[in-house]
Amino acid sequence: MDAVDSTRAFVKGVKRVIIKVGTAVVTRADGRLALGRLGALCEQIHELNSQGFEVILVTSGAVGVGRQRLRYRKLVNSSFADLQKPQIELDGKACAAVGQNGLLALYDTLFSQLDVTSAQLLVTDNDFRDPEFRKQLTETVESLLNLKVIPIFNENDAVSTRKAPYEDASGIFWDNDSLAALLALELKADLLVLLSDVEGLYSGPPSDPQSKLIHTYIKEMFEGLITFGDKSRVGRGGMTAKVKAAVYAAHAGIPVVITSGYATNNIIKVLQGERIGTLFHRDAQKWAPVGDVGARDMAVAARESSRRLQAMSPQDRSKILLDVADALEANEKLIRIENEADLAAAQQAGYEKSLISRLALKSGKISSLAKSIRVLANMEEPIGHVLKRTEITDGLVLEKTSSPLGVLLIIFESRPDALVQIASLAIRSGNGLVLKGGKEAKRSNAILHKVITSAIPENVGPRLIGLVTSREEIPDLLKLDDVIDLVIPRGSNKLVSQIKESTKIPVLGHADGICHVYVDKSANMDMAKKVVLDAKTDYPAACNAMETLLVHKDLVQNGCLDELIVELQIKGVVIHGGPRASSLLHIPEARSLHHEYSSLACTIEIVDDVYAAIDHIHRHGSAHTDSIITEDHEVAEIFLRQVDSSSVLHNASTRFSDGARFGLGAEVGISTSRIHARGPVGVEGLLTTRWIARGSGQVVDGDKGIVYTHKDLTSHA
């Protein structure tokens, strides 16, 4: 998720950037300065300044700050009788004069904390009528930028001669948005960023769920179609003013991005090429609009198709899965060809062996996937299952039944087999599905998606399962909390963390797979060797592979640990040690005890007893899967009861923590969450519940005449 968006590739050539921050961002709803937002703004400018960018700031807010201060001053100097009189609106010029001092003093304080120097430049509309002024202004700004000083511009409203409506034909600029656009031209900026109190330009009011964020503004496409709301609650501008300024600058060849000033890192993201906010660019009409038909339409289509799927009989839903399994086997040769093309590209690109291993659809994999789908098809019908049946009162019966969640968004990295498992689970559970796989498996995912959706009957439709092919659509999808019901990320810690930080939609999954095997002093060592080797070497890249081997201290003294290490090394496993093991065994110390290798490597640490092992797991584990090898059943029960992980095993490999091996048919992922599903997530984890009541005219009427029986009828369901 960190590649530059194709429409934002121009940012690589940006050096001089003008940032305009409006009053709605500078101040809070009560008129006071928004210190948190201003602090975040200054930190971003400092970071850009240190990276060699030339940053110019255009700020609003002086009038608002001054008004708040003067109102307070007037209040403390007023008698009770004065307060009863009609209040006269404060003069805006006086507010500007008072507020300018306080606003710039705050900027100076914040920048000083970051060892950044700032300079104040107040301008008026009339100043720009003088060519000599423009020349001197440019020279001054150039000097400041060469000294790494941040020029801070604001219109000098205290002495401005212009009056409302501020848009007469004689004006050179009318607000700080148009001032920023004018400065972008005068100072030859490479980019103009206009910070707003919303995420960008929407097709309608941002509060309307049907309004879409426009990522790239194309005048010919959107002019006349966009509905603007009110102007800014505190300033002279608003979105209309920002769009006019952006169109003006973009027409002159300066790209403009309108984005939210409320987010703490948006300016950095814009300059990293992320597709946030709305871009105005002179060449925008030449670009194919990216994602304009994508995100919401795909999710809505998946929901509509899922409702048709739910309306089918259980037998018909099962038949779809059987048809999918047959289609996979019938197209195995074509699937393997596309997968081999992905593998060749990954090897040529120099990807890590662990990623290439996850990417490969090895011999027999398609048959194995088809078999698991058939098992899933023949499982008990999961939808509409009556979990509880209660008689509320005579003639009124309430049922708690299983029900699909709705629409799932699954984001996964390099495992194309995950697409098959997830799609089959979605069909079985009656859910709509939107998939986004890793770019390294692009061809494999495309052919698998085509084969699977081709097997879905027309009365449900292939749009039951959508496949996102562009990274740029992910941020849009993550905002659709009114359409998408659950996000399940499958991949690296970085991927899962990014998803959790970027959405309001519930997220199910795990960030790490730090799985432990603890070999107790009473372990059968032949069994221990077999289990440890399987847990580490059967599939080192899997999230349920052993990453840390814990051994009882007695196994050091009797030489059993040495035997385990030799067996691991014979299999090519690179050994790292915890602090204790590293010191005693003279092996390289692990960089962290919370580390997922996803390769033929592991950490070994020595512990005093089962309680120390449990403590280590709780401190350094990820609540995924942990196993104990012991012949002492009392010790085993302590471990099984006290280790707080989603799957805990006794005398068995961590590799058993898998949906298919647990008999779930397949899994959509493994969850370490404590809410909803936990552990391998199969069909049941993709269901919720709802209540269905069947009555015969009952009314509450203040509970008069109602005799509540609350009789449990579950056994009769």
UniProtKB/Swiss-Prot annotation:
InterPro entries in the record: AceGlu_kinase-like_sf, Ald_DH/histidinol_DH, Ald_DH_C, Ald_DH_N, Aldehyde_DH_dom, Asp/Glu/Uridylate_kinase, G-glutamylP_reductase_CS, Glu/AcGlu_kinase
Entries under Pfam families matching the protein: AA_kinase, Aldedh
Q: Which residues bind ATP?
A: S196, D197, R236, G237, G238, M239, T240, A241, K242
Listed binding positions for substrate are S60, D157, N176
Identify one Gene Ontology CC term for this UniProt entry: cytoplasm
Give positions of region: Gamma-glutamyl phosphate reductase.
297-717
Recall the GO molecular function terms of this protein's record.
ATP binding; glutamate 5-kinase activity; glutamate-5-semialdehyde dehydrogenase activity
GO biological processes = L-proline biosynthetic process
What role does this protein play? P5CS plays a key role in proline biosynthesis, leading to osmoregulation in plants.
Under NCBIfam families, the record lists: P5CS (TIGR01092), PRK00197.1 (NF001221), proA (TIGR00407), proB (TIGR01027)
Q: Report the PANTHER family cross-referenced here.
A: DELTA-1-PYRROLINE-5-CARBOXYLATE SYNTHASE, GLUTAMATE SEMIALDEHYDE DEHYDROGENASE
Q: What name does this protein carry?
A: Delta-1-pyrroline-5-carboxylate synthase
Q: Which organism does this record belong to?
A: Actinidia deliciosa (Kiwi)
Q: What is the lineage of its organism?
A: Eukaryota, Viridiplantae, Streptophyta, Embryophyta, Tracheophyta
